[in-house]
Amino acid sequence: MNKKSKGTTIETLNYIDLFCGAGGFSLGFQKIGFENIFSIDIEKDFCKTYKYNFPNHKLIEKDISKLTEQEILNLTNNKGVDIIIGGPPCQGFSIAGNIGRKFIDDPRNRLFKEFVRIVDIVKPKYLMLR
């Protein structure tokens, strides 16, 4: 989608939201005029809230590690992506609630690699990792 401003066409920037949760990042990006390509999260309740907040967004409710390269390319329609945003789970790195558990054993700690994998496939102009 393009916008016009005083006779000048301004291209709408787009984004992908990984580990989207209820959509906090998407809300901010939507408010400044970005267009959502797709968002993904595995948590059912988060996805339910996201769908409520963004009924017109393409939401994938799936384990991000199961998202294939071909699925990603299909979701982006092989077009350029301006920015990938996301916040992989960090609870496994926190000392809070991890008494008696080694952070290295928490499978959530590997999810940042999925963010990197998707960035490598899509090659966006920018990324924002929280």
Can you say where each PLM-predicted feature lies in the sequence?
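Conserved active-site and SAM-binding loop architecture
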Residues: 1-130
